[in-house]
Amino acid sequence: FVMLSITTTVTTGVRRGANERLRTEMLWQAQAAERLALSIVERAASGGALKTASSEGGLFKQQIALPVERGAASLRFADASRCFNVNSIIDGDGKIVADEKTRFGLLLGAIGLGENKGAAIADAVADFIDRDSSQESQGAEDNFYTGLTTPFRTAGAPIASVSELRAIDGVTKEIYARIAPFLCAREVNKRVEINANALTPDFAPLIYAATDGTWPLEEIRAQISKTPPGGWSPDISAFWQPFGNPQGVNLAGLAGTEPTFIEARVLLEAEQRFVEETLIIKVPAGAAGGEPKVFSRVLGGGV
């Protein structure tokens, strides 16, 4: 009995040691893949390849196999700049930016929630992430959330992930599934410059909201469907030109022809264990210059 216990203990210890070594190895591989992803994006940006990276082409078209000693590893890129930045509705002091909150409501309404529901959720999100305790007309502050069966307080800070919206009053599972593909979490009080070359007609609400609802959704969808195979060129003015601009909407920085954020997804698999890392890489816009940098990373998996 004693020998059996010793054998079991040793076997368990060996397995744990092997698992820990495998986990450490895979985490090192994830770090190496991160450096490789940055290098690939930097080369693509400097070589002009990002101008032709559409939603399904160029850099975003193929999965890249990575060399590893055991198991398998892959890297895939996707545009991450066809989204509304939820954190843009507050400034650096945690105060609500009224114009951006209004645009957020316009977006939600255009996605299909309707004008009233869109405005209500925009109010609720603003109350959840701003620092004060003043309640927006259709919002909710701590006095609401602390009265729930499972009480909690508002974040009072920018969100790190769009998934945090599920905790907010009015954001049901069904509503979240509808709006999440249009949203992202980036820097406070900063709008994401939308990559027009990565848009599909389904994403017309982004342009609609960014331009304060100036042009009908159907016109925007029609223009997106006319995106040339090589993308809009020589610059974004070719995209805006058919609309005209009688209301004098400031179009500067609303959209561009290259991604300003790129998602890089690393998947490592070995001995029925896996590590998945999702990076958001910030790419300096146009002539801004500078190197791509990791804006955020999420590491997960079954190791």
Description of each model-found segment:
Residues F1-V303:
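Compositionally biased linear targeting/interaction segments
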